[in-house]
Swiss-Prot record:
GO molecular function, one term: D-glucose transmembrane transporter activity
UniProt source species: Helicobacter pylori (strain ATCC 700392 / 26695)
Topological type in the membrane: Multi-pass membrane protein
Alphabetical list of Pfam families matching this protein: MFS_1 (PF07690)
This protein's name: Putative glucose/galactose transporter
Record-stated family: Belongs to the major facilitator superfamily. FHS transporter (TC 2.A.1.7) family.
Length: 407
């Protein structure tokens, strides 16, 4: 079988980004689902995101080195296999009714996503040749399609089978925990199927086809890369923090049940999908850094309004932040890795480590929310945590993205 062309390779990678989005957003369903089952505090529930995104920090550098040796195509296949393993482990985790087991399975699942992320993002940029930001935004739009459909299927398959009330017995809680078994087992099978397809496609290893550079330069000597990695840290942290507590916020402030509240996640992540498809067109006319600056500023305004105004308007404002999140990750990534040459795979590994922001920022917001709950204060004040994240993104878009003359 001949090697796949660049266009077909880019097309096949959309399945990778779709699955990453679909699986990642299910954490936003797991948090309100497992919180009452295991009687968790907001902080303890946010450990779901801590374990999932903590894998990025622990495994990002590891996979960056591994992929630089085995190449992007095999990195993608390896990522799908590890992801399938983590998904399959949800079955015994639910059977034994162990929150710790769930967190362990999540870490393995997330390690697979880290591998896919580390291989997938630079793979797209190297295949794009001059259209890095636009093409990465386009394939990330399919990631957003996954994050849009994830809450719909997650709420239907998980919340619809939940029968637990406030005074549920241990047997009822274990039964509700098992509602995640079949959805995640299905994801395991789908991941293995994608691994087989990617292997048979024989994707081109574009990095090995690049001419070798004669000079070696430290990755961290590129300031625009360092600022960009920090930008990814704060972007993922802010986005995940808002998504993690959106369902719980709707439940608390609007007295909605979990399944009804979960539907609003569709608008949050669906907004990102619309924004990415729109961004793939507008980036032909607007400079990526200017587009990023506008979206960061818009997010700051929306979150500030939510904190100040409160009520339904606040929650709808927070939901609309998803639209402006749309182009942030691919734009920051492409600006941070521009002109890095053979350092690109290692840079991708470091950026994958920076996604640990999704592990650290939500627990901080969770701890703040617990404190506000204890003092019967406005829970929306906790959204000041992700607000600070977007201020850094604005800095990167205005100044941090600039490359030094000799880089």
């Amino acid at each position: 079988m001949q090697k796949t062309s660049n266009t077909l390779a880019l097309g096949s990678l959309t399945a990778l980004f779709f699955l990453m989005g679909f699986i990642t957003v299910l954490n936003d369903i797991l948090i309100p689902h497992l919180k009452p089952i295991f009687d968790l505090t907001y902080f303890e529930a946010s450990l779901i995101q801590f374990c999932f995104f903590g894998a990025y920090f622990i495994m990002g550098g590891v996979f960056g080195n591994v992929i630089s040796k085995i190449g992007y195509p095999f990195g993608v296949v390896l990522g799908f296999v590890i992801t399938a393993t983590g998904c399959a482990l949800f079955y015994p985790a639910a059977h034994f009714g162990s929150y710790g087991f769930f967190l362990g399975a999540l870490f393995i699942l997330a390690s697979g996503i880290v591998c896919l992320q580390t291989a997938g993002n630079p793979f797209v940029t190297l295949l794009s040749k001059g259209k890095e930001a636009r093409n990465l935004v386009l394939v990330q739009a399919f990631n957003s399609l996954g994050t849009t459909l994830g809450p719909i299927f997650g709420s239907l398959l998980i919340f619809s089978t939940t029968k637990m009330g406030d005074n549920a017995s241990l047997i009822d809680k274990l039964a509700d925990a098992k509602s995640v078994q079949m959805p995640y087992l299905g994801l395991a099978v789908f991941s293995l199927l994608l691994a087989l397809i990617m292997y048979l496609l024989k994707l081109p290893d574009v990095e090995k086809e690049m001419p070798k550079e004669t000079t070696q330069k430290s990755l961290f000597s590129h300031k625009h890369f360092v600022f960009g990695a920090l930008g990814i840290f704060f972007y993922v942290g802010g986005e995940v923090a808002i998504g993690s507590f959106l369902v719980l916020s709707f439940e608390k402030l609007l007295n909605l049940d979990s399944q009804s509240s979960a539907h609003y996640l569709v608008y949050y992540w669906g907004g990102a999908m619309v924004g990415r498809f729109l961004g793939s067109v507008l980036m032909n006319k607007i400079a990526p850094n200017k587009y990023l600056a506008f979206n960061a500023l818009s997010s700051i305004v929306l979150i500030a309004l939510a904190i100040i105004i409160g009520g339904k308007i606040a929650l709808f404002a927070l939901t609309f932040v998803g639209f402006f999140n749309s182009i942030m990750f691919p734009t920051i990534f492409s600006l941070a890795t521009l002109n890095l040459g053979h350092l690109t795979s290692k840079a991708s590994g470091v950026i994958s480590m920076a996604i640990v922001g999704g592990a650290l920022i939500p627990p901080i917001q969770g701890a703040v929310t617990d404190m506000l709950t204890a003092t019967e204060s406005n829970l929306l004040y906790a959204y000041g945590v992700p607000l600070l994240c977007y201020f850094y993104i604005l800095f990167f878009a205005l100044k941090g993205y600039k490359q030094e003359e000799n880089s």
